């Protein structure tokens, strides 16, 4: 009961905060536009203040509005009253926007289904990107000799989109039919993960490391684990997501294992480009079989790594995508 009361209190306190933030952006935005002599206004997808505040600034100044949608807005799992505001404002904001940037083709298709084919003329796909210089070159088949214990690595935050799939992997490793540990590198505190039901054990190690260390950690893995969950409260989010860590994984030089629903764009993207082993059913036996094959089939590992690098340089290179972004923001 105490936890429920605390959650209700947080919700009530959040109501004035979102409106105050929107008001601050709407008040300061026009001043900044005039001071900088800005040609466009860019609003980034969030839980409301940036999207709505950017829209109000656009209306006040008459400057074109560009949206950068890292995630869905309407239909996302947003704190109250963010979901209500998103349902009201997203159609209005999308109608007025000059350009809409999304991070994958799946999200573009989603918005075309939601708002009609004409919205597609406004949408530019710019995939999540990193600079490849942070990663070593020619990593194919590096450290692929047989080992007494293999390492499955997950890097990044853990919350509802990944949670049940990570728990499923932990359960599979607990059967001792796979000669591997799961090494989690997450900025989430161990207490937070424990509250989610994730704790250290015989087959699970929980670590933390600076962002600068992540390339080295990913390069040392035997498998890079990329999960999305089934039966969540935000299926639209699951189906349109391309997690930011995918970009890092593609260039890390180690095979990727995607454990996610068949309906997700992530699974479709991986299959189209053959850059990852994919388990698209919530099936523990299938997950176990694919992991064991991926650990021992060196030709398959090499093929996936090579295709991952090709996909990175085709869609995820920051050198290329920065030019696309610049062109989109200035046209």
Place the predicted regions along the sequence by residue.
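Nucleotide-sugar donor phosphate/pyrophosphate-binding loop at the beta->alpha transition
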Residues: 61-66, 74-92, 132
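A short, active-site helix/loop in glycosyltransferases that binds the activated sugar's phosphate group
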Residues: 93-122
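Membrane-proximal helix-turn-helix segments that form the acceptor-binding/catalytic region
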Residues: 23, 27-31, 52, 56-60, ...
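Carbohydrate-associated surface elements
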Residues: 106, 126-129
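Nucleotide-activated donor-binding/catalytic signature segment of Leloir-type glycosyltransferases, i.e.
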Residues: 149, 177, 186, 191-223
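Acidic anion/phosphate-binding donor-loop and adjacent secondary structure
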Residues: 78, 129-148
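A charged, aromatic-enriched C-terminal amphipathic alpha-helix characteristic of glycosyltransferases
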Residues: 282-288, 298-329
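Nucleotide-sugar-dependent
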Residues: 161-164, 212-216, 224-250, 256-268
């Amino acid at each position: 009961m105490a936890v429920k009361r605390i959650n209700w209190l947080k919700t009530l306190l959040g109501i004035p905060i979102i409106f105050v933030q929107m008001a601050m952006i709407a008040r300061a935005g026009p001043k900044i536009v005039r001071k900088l002599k800005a040609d466009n206004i860019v609003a980034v997808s969030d839980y409301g203040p940036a999207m709505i505040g950017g829209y109000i600034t656009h209306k006040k100044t008459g400057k074109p509005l560009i949206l950068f949608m890292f995630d869905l807005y309407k239909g996302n799992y947003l704190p109250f009253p963010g979901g209500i505001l998103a349902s009201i404002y997203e159609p209005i904001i999308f109608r007025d926007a000059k350009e809409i940037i999304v991070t994958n083709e799946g999200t573009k298709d989603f918005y075309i289904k939601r708002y009609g084919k004409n919205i597609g003329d406004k949408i530019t796909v710019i995939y999540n990107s990193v600079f490849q210089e942070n990663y070593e070159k020619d990593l194919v088949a590096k450290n692929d000799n047989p080992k007494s214990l293999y390492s499955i690595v997950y890097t990044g935050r853990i919350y509802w989109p990944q949670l049940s799939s990570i728990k499923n992997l932990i359960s599979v490793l607990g059967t001792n039919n796979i000669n591997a540990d799961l090494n989690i590198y997450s900025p989430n505190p161990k207490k937070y993960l424990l509250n989610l039901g994730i704790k250290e054990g015989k087959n699970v190690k929980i670590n933390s490391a600076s962002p600068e260390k992540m390339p080295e950690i990913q390069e040392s893995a035997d498998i890079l684990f990329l999960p999305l969950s089934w039966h969540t409260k935000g299926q639209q989010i699951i189906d349109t997501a391309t997690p930011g860590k995918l970009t890092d994984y593609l260039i890390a030089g180690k095979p990727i294992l995607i454990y996610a629903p068949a309906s997700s764009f992530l699974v479709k993207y991986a299959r189209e480009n053959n850059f990852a082993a994919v388990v698209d059913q919530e099936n523990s036996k299938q997950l176990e079989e694919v992991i064991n094959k991926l650990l021992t089939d060196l030709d398959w590992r090499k093929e996936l790594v090579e295709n991952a690098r090709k996909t990175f340089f085709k869609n995820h290179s920051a050198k290329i995508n920065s030019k696309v972004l610049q062109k989109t923001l200035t046209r």
